[in-house]
Amino acid sequence: MRLILAGTGSAVGKTTIATGIMKAFSREYRVQPFKVGPDYIDPTYHTLATGHSSRNLDSFFMSEPQIREAFQRGLNISKADMGIIEGVRGLYEGISPTGDVGNTASVAKALNAPVVLILNARSLVKSAAAIVIGFKHL
């Protein structure tokens, strides 16, 4: 099983939610944590929550086959039942405003992984639905 937790942007609670979900699943399953991009701070929380060293998946430095290989290698080394991946910034934000390199969507595509979208819904009702629908259709 694989799952990506992605945000509508930065500071929407991705790390808190991802770490909590990793910890919750770790009670029943062996979870291998991953982080999109070159981040080395957030993975320390993942490691504490799961007991397995978090690994980075970065489409700036890795091709799609390399992302798939690194993901599978991480699962194999930890003998994990599932891989949970925390995204970086917004789902579609990468090194270029128009390309996919370095963004969470490119890693989701490479792994054919479902995405859970995290957004800050403070003071939102119908607008939250519009944001989610917009992300779905982009």
Predicted regions and their residues:
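ATP-dependent carboxylate-amine ligase catalytic core
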Residues: R2-V12, T16, M22-L111, V115, ...
